[in-house]
């Protein structure tokens, strides 16, 4: 009975925090914590300090990249690619947004490219919903495939002491599973999007809308472009510093002999990532003369700090509650998950929707899953399931896609659940999880 009451308290905090949005999600964890500790006298769990430190380092480097103009270079290259292949925008666009996320570690880079995707689609009489919805989904799917994303480094940190038949999960082991499985999922989204919805010339509602001259001008109006901008060399230098750091981190992750050893053990990749991300930010500031004051004012830094508070409050609250009832949870869920391993992926997917964060969902669920005996291989194979907040169209990138689509084809349906993102999201995540299991088996984890 007490467990049920405490679980309801946690769910109320999650629902209300998600509804308020932003930093409120993590702060609401504080309410749950105080009630659990001072009212129910549960011993406080341990906050995920390692995960939070990694997030701080990665966000600092990514925000510095944006402040330096290095991100503009990536976006300019992406726009050139899209405008050279307009007929294939429904397939190319989600790959572009996913790649940007993989390189930058955050899906928030999609906001700048969405108007360009719309312009390419509408000027070629392609239903904008096709590439717009796919691109928003693709940007978020890329998070679990990025070597510098909060979700990936968090998962590596949480699985750092876990062995798979005597073998530790290395940084590149995880990426070797998540990158190809994610890209195959993106391909599935692109193929689906190619055929979805009515062509614009057969869409009676759209044709009626543009029959009004003002509406037609609004729908087919010009969009801002990066192609006519000559970016300074410092922007290019910042981009190469950032990409070079990612390459070095990947190399150190691939070969533990390249890392210094202490007590017979190579330096943890969790610490390596922190060190090199801080180094990256410092080099960009020094070599490109980026104004440090501008770093804390951009979208990447803001969203990253919100992620830290979310992981802090939610994961600490969940650890406190589930840690106190671990024996009961093991008894109820342990056998079920062993018999139906896919149940873990469904739980992770739903929690992700509640918290609107892949990193926060992993931080809340992975420690519990390990404690009740879920095979770590299942956790790795099902990693793409940490993206579930496409289920309802409340995430900022989805809302942005709707706003940037002036044709109105990217939309939220009458029943809310029948929106433009639900099918691409289900297809992409499901296909990625299936291939995640296949690649995990190929590499000997399953």
Curated annotation (Swiss-Prot):
Q: Name one GO molecular function term.
A: succinate:fumarate antiporter activity
Where does it mainly reside? membrane
Location relative to the cell: Cell inner membrane
GO biological process, any: anaerobic respiration
**Effect of loss of the gene:** The growth the dcuA-dcuB double mutant is severely impaired during anaerobic growth with glycerol plus either fumarate, malate or aspartate, whereas single mutants are either unaffected or less affected, depending on the C4-dicarboxylate. The triple mutant dcuA-dcuB-dcuC is completely devoid of C4-dicarboxylate transport (exchange and uptake) during anaerobic growth, and the bacteria are no longer capable of growth by fumarate respiration. Deletion or inactivation of the gene causes constitutive expression of DcuS/DcuR-regulated genes in the absence of C4-dicarboxylates.
GO CC term (a single one): plasma membrane
Q: What mutagenesis or variant effect is reported for residue 394 to N/S? A: Requires fumarate for expression. Shows wild-type transport activity
**Any transmembrane segments, and where?**
1-18, 23-39, 54-70, 179-194, 235-252, 269-287, 314-331, 342-365, 426-443
Question: Could you list which ranges are intramembrane per the record?
Answer: 88-105, 106-114, 115-128, 129-133, 134-159
What does the annotation give as the result of altering residue 353 to A?
A: Constitutively expressed
Membrane-topology annotation of the record: Multi-pass membrane protein
Ranges facing Cytoplasmic side:
19-22, 71-87, 195-234, 288-313, 366-425
**Consequence of mutating residue 398 to E?**
Requires fumarate for expression. Impaired for transport to some extent
Q: What catalytic reaction does the record list? A: fumarate(in) + succinate(out) = fumarate(out) + succinate(in); (S)-malate(in) + succinate(out) = (S)-malate(out) + succinate(in); L-aspartate(in) + succinate(out) = L-aspartate(out) + succinate(in); (S,S)-tartrate(out) + succinate(in) = (S,S)-tartrate(in) + succinate(out)
- What controls how active this protein is? Active under anaerobic conditions.
Q: What does this protein do?
A: Bifunctional protein with a transport and a regulatory function. Responsible for the transport of C4-dicarboxylates during anaerobic growth. Catalyzes the uptake of fumarate, malate, aspartate or D-tartrate coupled to the export of succinate. Can also catalyze the uptake (without exchange) of fumarate. May function primarily as a C4-dicarboxylate transporter during fumarate respiration. Required for anaerobic growth on D-tartrate. In addition, possesses a regulatory function, which is independent from the transport function, and is required for the response of the DcuS/DcuR two-component system to C4-dicarboxylates. DcuB interacts physically with DcuS and converts DcuS to the C4-dicarboxylate responsive form. However, the site for C4-dicarboxylate perception and specificity in sensing by DcuB/DcuS is located on DcuS and not on DcuB.
Q: Which family does it belong to?
A: Belongs to the DcuA/DcuB transporter (TC 2.A.13.1) family.
- Oligomeric form and interacting partners: Interacts with DcuS. DcuB/DcuS complexes are present both in the absence or presence of fumarate.
Entry-linked NCBIfam families: Dcu, PRK09412.1, PRK12489.1
Question: What is this protein identified as?
Answer: Anaerobic C4-dicarboxylate transporter DcuB
């Amino acid at each position: 009975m007490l467990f049920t009451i405490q679980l309801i308290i946690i769910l109320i905090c999650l629902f209300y925090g998600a509804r308020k949005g932003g930093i409120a999600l993590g702060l609401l964890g504080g309410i749950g914590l105080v009630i659990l500790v001072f009212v129910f006298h549960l011993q406080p769990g341990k906050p995920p300090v390692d995960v939070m430190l990694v997030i701080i380092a990665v966000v600092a480097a990514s925000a510095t990249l944006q402040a330096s103009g290095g991100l503009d270079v990536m976006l300019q290259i992406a726009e050139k690619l899209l405008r050279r292949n307009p007929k294939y925008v429904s397939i190319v666009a989600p790959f572009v947004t996913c790649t940007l996320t993989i390189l930058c570690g955050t899906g928030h880079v999609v906001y700048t490219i969405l108007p360009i995707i719309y312009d390419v689609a509408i000027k070629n009489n392609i239903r904008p919903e096709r590439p717009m919805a796919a691109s928003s989904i693709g940007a978020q799917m890329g998070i679990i495939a990025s070597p510098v994303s909060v979700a990936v480094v968090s998962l590596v940190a949480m699985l750092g002491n876990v062995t798979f038949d005597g073998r530790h999960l290395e940084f590149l082991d995880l990426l070797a599973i998540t990158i190809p499985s994610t890209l195959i999922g993106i391909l599935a989204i692109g193929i689906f999007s190619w055929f979805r919805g009515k062509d614009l010339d057969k869409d009676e509602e759209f044709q009626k809308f543009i029959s009004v001259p003002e509406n037609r001008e609004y729908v087919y109006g010009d969009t801002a472009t990066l192609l006519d901008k000559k970016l300074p060399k410092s922007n290019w230098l910042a981009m190469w510093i950032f990409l070079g750091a990612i390459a070095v981190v990947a190399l150190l992750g691939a070969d533990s002999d390249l890392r210094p050893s202490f007590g017979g053990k190579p330096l943890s990749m969790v610490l390596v990532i922190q060190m090199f991300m801080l180094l990256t930010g410092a080099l960009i500031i020094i070599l490109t003369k980026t104004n440090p004051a501008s770093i804390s004012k951009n979208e990447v830094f803001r969203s990253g700090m919100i992620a830290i508070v979310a992981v802090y409050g939610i994961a600490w609250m969940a650890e406190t509650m589930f840690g106190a009832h671990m024996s009961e949870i093991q008894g109820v869920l342990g056998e079920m998950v062993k018999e139906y391993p896919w149940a873990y992926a469904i739980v992770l997917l739903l929690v992700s929707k509640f918290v609107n964060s892949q990193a926060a969902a992993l931080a809340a669920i992975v420690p519990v899953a390990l404690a009740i005996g879920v095979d770590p291989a299942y956790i790795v194979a099902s990693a793409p399931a940490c993206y579930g907040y496409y289920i309802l169209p409340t995430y900022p990138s989805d809302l942005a896609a709707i706003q940037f689509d002036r044709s109105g084809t990217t939309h939220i349906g009458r029943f809310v659940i029948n929106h433009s993102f639900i099918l691409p999201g289900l297809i992409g995540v499901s296909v990625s999880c299936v291939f995640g299991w296949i690649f995990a088996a190929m590499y000997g984890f399953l």
